[in-house]
Design a protein with these regions (language model features):
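Glycine-rich anion-binding surface patch
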Residues: 1-113, 117, 121-129
Length: 129
């Protein structure tokens, strides 16, 4: 499936800004269709739950839209900073290029949201291919 690059960019901006109302509207724009395709509805739901912090939903969305792509998390504590500053880093990488070139690297205190942003960035990158 191909996605509209501008709609994805708008969605990513709403996620990064933490704009709940804007996110819901942009999420429907990206993952809804007039015929209400069930697969797209599930993607919209997974995206919404990942935005709210569900790692299961982030993983399900990743599998649905980036089948065959790699992913992983790293923990960063930031140069001796206290643990409360810990950030999870979500990596999303192209198939067959796991160590060579990751497409998206996102740091966020909310690992599900980091994974969601990394997934959206990867979809945006696919629009340019």
């Amino acid at each position: 499936m191909t996605y509209d690059k501008q709609a994805l960019t708008d969605l990513m901006a709403k996620i990064e800004a933490g704009d709940d109302a804007g996110f819901r509207k942009a999420n429907r724009t990206v993952f809804s269709t007039p015929c209400q395709d069930m697969a797209l509805q599930l993607r919209e739901e997974h995206s919404r739950h990942a935005y709210k912090g569900s790692l299961d939903a982030a993983k399900a969305l990743h599998a649905a839209v980036l089948g065959g792509w790699g992913w992983r998390f790293d923990e960063h504590y930031g140069d001796g900073m206290p643990a409360k500053f810990e950030r999870k880093t979500a990596w999303v990488s192209m198939p067959d290029n796991w160590r060579v070139g990751h497409t998206s690297l996102v740091k966020d205190n909310n690992p599900a949201r980091a994974w969601l942003i990394a997934t959206i960035k990867a979809l945006i990158a696919e629009c340019d291919v």
